[in-house]
Amino acid sequence: MTMTLAKRFTAEVVGTFILVFFGPGAAVITLMIANGADKPNEFNIGIGALGGLGDWFAIGMAFALAIAAVIYSLGRISGAHINPAVTIALWSIGRFPGREVVPYIVAQFIGAALGSLLFLACVGPAAATVGGLGATAPFPGIGYGQAILTEAIGTFLLMLVIMGVAVDERAPPGFAGLVIGLTVGGIITTIGNITGSSLNPARTFGPYLGDSLMGINLWQYFPIYVIGPIVGAVAAAWLYNYLAKE
């Protein structure tokens, strides 16, 4: 059954909301526990500054579960892109209609904004001043080019998995949510301490918007999380398309 664009738009809003509320939300709680929620300080270096592997594993699993939940609950409605880089990559290989790219991306950004703003409303100002709303930024000492490359590599792996388990009609059914979610969790655990491991322009946009309302400005890093994920996702989609052709 073909869903209307309005229904798919709504599903992308809801799906991205779930991703950003629970994924970056887990990063916020981790930072608040580590730093003390009663000691707010201006958050200005992003979650890339988190240290322990245990912290990153916990955050990665929160993302994994949120993504799996979205894919299994909303995937049949909109495809559960919940990521502008995925939408653009699928369009670039002819697997998604061009006329729907902008509506999907708008929906994803709306969902991300709602996720961060409602998390801020639930937790209070410390979610931003201590936890930065889970915003991503390069770890101190990581250059702009290094950060873009890291995000591109991480999103390349994610998109390659998406192509193999969700887009390719030959993929065994029922595993997409689990495999994609665990892939994101693994990538976050691996590169989180370099860039915060966004892999998704919308996932970064939401926290940046919420932080801006609290006087925290990280927008100088936003191009990293647009260029890197889009380049990585498009490259993976084209490579898989080439390799999978019989």
UniProtKB/Swiss-Prot annotation:
Residue ranges, Cytoplasmic side: 1-12, 78-104, 168-173, 239-246
Similarity annotation: Belongs to the MIP/aquaporin (TC 1.A.8) family.
PROSITE patterns membership: MIP
Domain of life: Archaea
Classification of source organism: Archaea, Methanobacteriati, Methanobacteriota, Archaeoglobi, Archaeoglobales
Any one of the GO CC terms: plasma membrane
Name of the protein this chain belongs to: Probable aquaporin AqpM
Keyword Lipid metabolism recorded: no
